[in-house]
Each structure stands twice: as C-alpha cells, then as structure tokens.
C-alpha cells in the first residue's frame, strides 16, 4: 500500500497547491 500512497500524495498536493 505504501508505494501507492507515496504515488498519490504528491499528486494530491500538486492539485491542491497547484505547484508541481
């Protein structure tokens, strides 16, 4: 599960903060 979470978290942060 950890690899999936580590992959999703950055995407969520990118969408929320709009800073990629």
UniProtKB/Swiss-Prot annotation:
Keywords: Amphibian defense peptide, Antibiotic, Antimicrobial, Disulfide bond, Immunity, Innate immunity, Secreted. Expressed by the skin glands. It is found in: Secreted. InterPro entries: Antimicrobial_frog_1. Coiled coil: none annotated. One of its GO terms (biological process) is innate immune response. GO terms for cellular component: extracellular region. Its main location: secreted. Disulfide bonds join 14-20. Belongs to the frog skin active peptide (FSAP) family. Brevinin subfamily. Antimicrobial peptide. This is Brevinin-1LT. It comes from Rana latastei.
């Amino acid at each position: 599960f950890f690899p999936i979470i580590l992959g999703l978290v950055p995407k969520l942060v990118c969408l929320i903060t709009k800073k990629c």
